[in-house]
């Protein structure tokens, strides 16, 4: 094909010429002609040519078929691959060029090609006459379709008939008329301020600035609803509020200047609408810099907006977050001064409850459930208290939405009672099949088979009854959901009729169909309430406070649900649970347990951690073990303990590891070890082990954690410690505690000495913020005996995994306690003694294969005070004489 300059054409016109080559090749024709180009134009996705022809009264199908027939009759050449420009197409391009010059356009567009087609002597004029289309009619249609935004085809992408606002915008007022927008509750001051700015003569462009989720977009939707209701000044009545979709505006803009031309066309349509259009740009910061990479930094979208904004030709509402406004808009003072700031603050809990009450019917209709007022209040209060990284009302609305979705899923799924029953039935049927299939054993199992048959019959009757009840309840709830949806639709129709002043239709709907639906719904609700009164319901239809608390607990890992009876008993007996692992240290155990009970009963200070403790005492007395036991008791897992060995934070710069490196340093994006751990697991036990070894600057960081329950990490995020237990351990003053020995009378004097040593090392403002400073006393021999039992239980569990039982006599346990007792080092020498005196010999016996599965290892003390081991074989059904007992003697292990 001969070269043709693509710079003479708009993008769509050139795309049609390029695509015409594909059409010609499919027809195996070497000569590119008019029919190929027109077929390509009719096939374009944008449909500009088809739209122009349709407006001119030509059915596209009536034109396509004759074109295809004519093209198939042209000569074919299967061997040729080179395409040539036909004489007819060359003539068409000349005619299109004349039309361009006549209309004073810069590029040849689709409309110019169509004008050339109807004047084409070869095929176009003949087909056009058959369809009653002439050049004059087509020209009139094209001029009528020319968008105000594109009087000339001055850019490569622009097509005069393109409906830019409908393609790149969303009419909020039309959605408000159709009742498709959620009701906007409150925000009267902000909406009034927006209306006030829009009513100005110049710079009439408000920008809504607020945190994500506070309701900036909802304010624009509220304005659209007020425009539809006529509750606005005359300057805004009958106006259209169009939300600009920046995503679709930018998407696919691959050619030079394409994005800018799209935006310019949209802005021209708005400015030439005689003030009928108000533009809403959500995420306004995306406009600044958009498109700058295509034609240089001077040609971004923000610079296209500035002149129109300053002159008042364009009324535009922007919305962006506080951070993005600071990062983008404020850096361009010329753009910033053209917008008037309207700050949108987070609503209070009371305002959020009012917003949720306004949205309640929409969510009930969507999910087909009922939402109690208590659930709405719980959503506002619990989200405000426990979800600190998001903002009201968005997080409260999300709680209601997810809790409703969860309940709807439960309604459509089988109840847990029915599933448990079916599993039990399956288990019994498998057992029955197994016992019946054993040859010759049927008589042996006859009693059990009879029991299974009786139980199966009972369970099957129960299953049939529950199935019937479930289907009945499910049908009632589904019918209730359907009626709620219909009621919501009717309400929308009533509102629309009232807006249109169609009082007859409104009264007919409101007092006829709507009342009938409400009576049906009330009857079904009474049936459901009757089932509830009998206490026989399998399904729930109401979202309650407990559902909201469950969602909050799932999101945050903070237990905010109502206490179950099992957990209530566990909390009341928390000291005994902790004492199963921590021997002695009653004061510390009682203080920690009391703090946990206060928190779960809702009596703690909401702005401080659950508890902050400083454990003091010599090594090995249970300071770290108590923190581990607490984590295990609360979370049933020791790995729930967030532990920091403060000996790793002895340098000044190591504090950045806790809250994150400052900007400009490596690791800034990764966050801090402490801040990230608490952000992901806010309900945790945080242990700062051997806190006195840390650099003094670390304690400055801990001040706000202990007092306000919060810190700010390197990225400016607030980390909430209000649901954490802070435990710090230290060996400061342990020498004074060791001097005390077992004399109770010297406790006060020792405590004074220890506190004096604390004051010398820690500053008063740090010590004053700790809830309780607890002294751990040295372990006595009696307490060490109890620790022996705990340590041996661990060893018994390890051996039980190898089918070996371990029996330690009381004398052997006392012997271990004596050998492991050291008041200076606490319980750690005992652990080493057990390792040396029991674990090492047992490991050797296992490797020597002295044990079989089911054997028992007995540990006792001989006459010389040394431990001895004996392997006991399991007793079999065969009676063996005592003299033949195969006992294995093991030499005593010296100390």
Swiss-Prot record:
Binding positions for ATP 2 per the UniProt entry: 617-624
Region feature (NBD2): 567-778
Chief location bin: cytoplasm
Annotated region described as Repeat 2, given as residue ranges: 85-148
Subcellular location per the Swiss-Prot or TrEMBL entry: Cytoplasm
GO biological process terms on file: cellular response to heat; protein refolding
Segments of this protein annotated with the region Linker: 347-557
Chain residue ranges for the region called C-terminal: 779-895
Highest taxon, organism lineage: Bacteria
Coiled coil spans: 397-533
Location of the Clp R domain: 6-148
One cellular component (GO) term of this entry: cytoplasm
Pfam families xref list: AAA, AAA_2, AAA_lid_9, Clp_N, ClpB_D2-small
InterPro entries: AAA+_ATPase (IPR003593), ATPase_AAA_core (IPR003959), Chaperonin_ClpB (IPR017730), Clp_ATPase_C (IPR019489), Clp_N_dom_sf (IPR036628), Clp_R_dom (IPR004176), ClpA/B (IPR001270), ClpA/B_CS1 (IPR018368)
Gene3D superfamilies documented for this protein: 1.10.8.60, Clp, N-terminal domain, P-loop containing nucleotide triphosphate hydrolases
Keywords: ATP-binding, Chaperone, Coiled coil, Cytoplasm, Nucleotide-binding, Repeat, Stress response
Disulphide bond pairs: none
Similarity annotation: Belongs to the ClpA/ClpB family.
Domain observations: The Clp repeat (R) domain probably functions as a substrate-discriminating domain, recruiting aggregated proteins to the ClpB hexamer and/or stabilizing bound proteins. The NBD2 domain is responsible for oligomerization, whereas the NBD1 domain stabilizes the hexamer probably in an ATP-dependent manner. The movement of the coiled-coil domain is essential for ClpB ability to rescue proteins from an aggregated state, probably by pulling apart large aggregated proteins, which are bound between the coiled-coils motifs of adjacent ClpB subunits in the functional hexamer.
UniProt-listed PANTHER family: ATP-DEPENDENT CLP PROTEASE, HEAT SHOCK PROTEIN 104
Subunit structure: Homohexamer. The oligomerization is ATP-dependent.
Function in brief: Part of a stress-induced multi-chaperone system, it is involved in the recovery of the cell from heat-induced damage, in cooperation with DnaK, DnaJ and GrpE. Acts before DnaK, in the processing of protein aggregates. Protein binding stimulates the ATPase activity; ATP hydrolysis unfolds the denatured protein aggregates, which probably helps expose new hydrophobic binding sites on the surface of ClpB-bound aggregates, contributing to the solubilization and refolding of denatured protein aggregates by DnaK.
Further remark: Not induced by heat shock or other stresses, it is expressed constitutively in the cell.
Protein name as annotated: Chaperone protein ClpB 2
Origin species: Synechococcus elongatus (strain ATCC 33912 / PCC 7942 / FACHB-805) (Anacystis nidulans R2)
Gene name, Swiss-Prot/TrEMBL: clpB2
């Amino acid at each position: 094909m001969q070269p043709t300059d693509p710079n003479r054409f708009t993008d769509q016109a050139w795309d049609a010429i390029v695509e015409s080559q594909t059409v010609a090749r499919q027809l195996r024709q070497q000569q590119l002609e008019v029919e190929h180009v027109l077929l390509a134009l009719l096939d374009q996705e944008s449909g500009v040519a088809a739209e122009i022809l349709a407006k001119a009264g030509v059915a596209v199908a009536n034109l396509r078929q004759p074109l295809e027939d004519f093209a198939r009759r042209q000569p074919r050449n299967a061997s040729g691959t080179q395409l040539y420009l036909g004489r007819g197409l060359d003539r068409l391009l000349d005619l299109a060029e004349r039309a361009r010059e006549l209309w004073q356009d810069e590029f040849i567009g689709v409309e110019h090609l169509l004008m050339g087609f109807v004047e084409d002597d070869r095929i176009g004029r003949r087909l056009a006459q058959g369809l009653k289309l002439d050049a004059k009619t087509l020209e009139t249609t094209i001029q009528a379709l020319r968008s105000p935004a594109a009087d000339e085809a001055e850019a490569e992408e622009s097509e005069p008939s393109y409906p830019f606002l409908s393609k790149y915008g969303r009419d909020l007022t039309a959605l408000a008329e159709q009742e498709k927008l959620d009701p906007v509750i409150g925000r009267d001051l902000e909406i009034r301020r927006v209306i006030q700015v829009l009513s100005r003569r110049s710079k009439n462009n408000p920008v809504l600035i607020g945190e994500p989720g506070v309701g900036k977009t909802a304010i624009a939707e509220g304005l659209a609803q007020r425009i539809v209701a006529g509750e606005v000044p005359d300057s805004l009545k009958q106006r259209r509020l169009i939300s600009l979709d920046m995503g679709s505006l930018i998407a696919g803009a691959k050619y030079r200047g394409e994005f800018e031309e799209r935006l310019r066309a949209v802005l021209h349509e708005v400015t030439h609408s005689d003030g009928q259009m108000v533009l809403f740009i959500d995420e306004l910061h995306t406009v600044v810099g958009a498109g700058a990479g295509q034609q240089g930094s001077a040609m971004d979208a923000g610079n296209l907006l500035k002149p129109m904004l300053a002159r008042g030709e364009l009324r535009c509402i922007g919305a962006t977050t506080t951070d993005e406004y600071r990062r983008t808009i404020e850096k361009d003072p010329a753009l910033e001064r053209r917008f008037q700031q309207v700050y949108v603050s987070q609503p209070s809990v009371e305002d959020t409850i009012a917003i949720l009450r306004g949205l309640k019917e929409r969510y009930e209709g969507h999910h087909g459930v009922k939402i109690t007022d208590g659930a709405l209040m719980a959503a506002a209060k619990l989200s405000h208290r426990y979800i600190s990284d998001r903002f009201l009302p968005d997080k409260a609305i999300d709680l209601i939405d997810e809790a409703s979705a969860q309940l709807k899923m439960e309604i459509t799924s089988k109840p847990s009672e029915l599933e448990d029953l079916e599993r039990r039935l399956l288990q019994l049927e498998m057992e029955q099949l197994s016992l019946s299939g054993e040859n010759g054993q049927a008589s042996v199992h006859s009693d059990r088979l009879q029991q299974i048959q009786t139980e199966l019959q009972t369970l099957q009757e129960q299953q049939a009854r529950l199935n019937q009840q479930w289907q009945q309840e499910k049908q009632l709830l589904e019918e209730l959901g359907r009626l709620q949806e219909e009621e919501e639709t009717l309400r929308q129709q009533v509102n629309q009729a009232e807006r249109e002043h169609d009082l007859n239709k409104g009264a007919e709907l409101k007092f006829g169909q709507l009342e009938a639906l409400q009576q049906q719904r009330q009857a079904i609700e009474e049936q459901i309430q009757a089932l509830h009164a009998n206490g026989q319901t399998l399904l729930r239809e109401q979202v309650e406070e407990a559902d909201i608390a469950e969602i909050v607990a799932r999101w945050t890992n903070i237990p905010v649900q109502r206490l179950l009876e099992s957990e209530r008993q566990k909390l009341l007996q928390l000291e005994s649970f902790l004492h199963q692992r921590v021997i002695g240290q009653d004061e510390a155990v009682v203080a920690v347990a009391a703090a946990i009970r206060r928190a779960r009963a809702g009596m703690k200070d909401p702005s401080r951690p659950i508890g902050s403790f400083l454990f003091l005492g010599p090594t090995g007395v249970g300071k770290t073990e108590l923190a581990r036991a607490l984590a295990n008791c609360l979370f049933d897992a020791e790995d729930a303990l967030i532990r920091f060995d403060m000996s790793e934070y002895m340098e000044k710069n190591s504090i950045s590891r806790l809250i994150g490196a400052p900007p400009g340093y490596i690791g800034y994006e990764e966050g801090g070890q402490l801040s990230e751990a608490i952000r992901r697991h806010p309900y945790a036990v945080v242990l700062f082990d051997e806190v006195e070894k840390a650099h003094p600057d670390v304690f400055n960081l801990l001040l706000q954690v202990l007092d306000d329950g919060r810190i700010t990490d390197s990225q400016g995020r607030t980390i909430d410690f209000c649901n954490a237990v802070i435990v710090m351990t230290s060996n400061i003053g342990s020498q004074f505690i060791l001097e005390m020995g077992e004399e109770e009378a010297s406790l006060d004097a020792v405590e004074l000495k220890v506190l004096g040593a604390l004051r010398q090392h820690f500053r008063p403002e740090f010590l004053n913020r700790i809830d309780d400073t607890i002294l751990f006393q040295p372990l006595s021999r009696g307490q060490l005996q109890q620790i022996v039992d705990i340590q041996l239980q661990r060893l018994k569990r390890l051996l039980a995994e190898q089918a070996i039982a371990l029996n330690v006599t009381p004398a052997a346990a006392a012997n271990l306690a004596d050998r492991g007792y050291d008041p200076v080092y606490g319980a750690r020498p005992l652990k080493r003694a057990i390792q040396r005196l029991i674990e090492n010999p047992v490991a050797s016996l296992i490797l020597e294969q002295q044990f079989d599965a089911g054997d028992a290892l007995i540990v006792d003390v001989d006459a010389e005070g040394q431990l001895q081991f004996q392997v006991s074989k399991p007793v079999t059904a065969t009676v063996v004489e005592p003299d033949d007992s195969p006992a294995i003697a093991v030499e005593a292990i010296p100390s």
